[in-house]
Curated annotation (Swiss-Prot):
UniProt organism field: Nitratiruptor sp. (strain SB155-2)
GO BP terms, alphabetized: biotin biosynthetic process
Protein name: Biotin synthase
Domain Radical SAM core residues, every copy: 1-227
Enzyme Commission number(s) from the entry: 2.8.1.6
InterPro entries: Aldolase_TIM (IPR013785), BATS_dom (IPR010722), Biotin_synth/BioAB (IPR002684), Biotin_synthase (IPR024177), Elp3/MiaA/NifB-like_rSAM (IPR006638), rSAM (IPR007197)
Regions that span the bilayer: none
UniProt catalytic activity: (4R,5S)-dethiobiotin + (sulfur carrier)-SH + 2 reduced [2Fe-2S]-[ferredoxin] + 2 S-adenosyl-L-methionine = (sulfur carrier)-H + biotin + 2 5'-deoxyadenosine + 2 L-methionine + 2 oxidized [2Fe-2S]-[ferredoxin]
Top-rank EC class of the record's enzyme: transferase
Entry's family note: Belongs to the radical SAM superfamily. Biotin synthase family.
Binding sites annotated in the UniProt record for [2Fe-2S] cluster: C60, C95, C153
Reported function: Catalyzes the conversion of dethiobiotin (DTB) to biotin by the insertion of a sulfur atom into dethiobiotin via a radical-based mechanism.
Amino acid sequence: MKVYLCAISNISSGVCAEDCKFCTQSTKYRADIPRYKYKSIETIVEEAKKAKAAKAIGFCLVTAGKGIDDKILDFVTQAARAVKKEVPDISLIGCNGTAEVWQLKELKHAGIDNYNHNLETAKSFYEQICSTHSWEERYQTCLNAKEAGLNLCTGGIFGLGESKEQREEMMDQIASLEPMSVPINFYHPNEALPLPQTTIDPSDALSIIQDMRKRVPNAMIMVAGGRELVFGEQWPKILDAGANAIVIGDYLTTKGERPDKDIQTLQKLGVEIATSCHE
């Protein structure tokens, strides 16, 4: 099998006015995280170069906030063009919240190849997690990304207090969008957040990956946030469960494993690391 590696850059951090209960970037909670409006373009380009050197085929430009406005659109398109100029063969992913088709077309024109917008949780559970924007807005943005000609990456977060039935519901809703990639995140507790300070059981996490794979047999399944927390050194079990992609390096506001250590683990297992999104 081949494993796909992706890196992310939090190009705008901790300045979100929404109230998603799982997210330390919300200004409504007092999580101890870095907060800044924008990174410099130079910093973003250097991070992309490091990601490519660490065998990442994807590099995600993430902004904090509900969705795209004119300032965010201008900044992300600038960043995308700068990265593509210096690292032309890396696949760029935009993750910039809710968006209209015309905005997403602007991102595509600037060099964004894929758009990540997670459903986060099941429609029936969503109102218990977020009140400042609707689940329907999130779903529509996913449809908009496809209409704009972008590859869709959409998944969610497990372990927020949802029931088993709601997990099944969310997986069905994700599958209905026929995404290219499905990021699976596991909730990372933080004392500043109004959710239980509990972590999903590893066996449950593996079952989720298996169930998701049954629904999207041809999609990339990427285990992202919470991988190290939930699985520790046993994380390669996700590959047997059906995952074929991971995020390397740090996440938005939590630390990840060193990329070289993950690569070493994969090489010891004899796993081939993909060199293109389309292999």
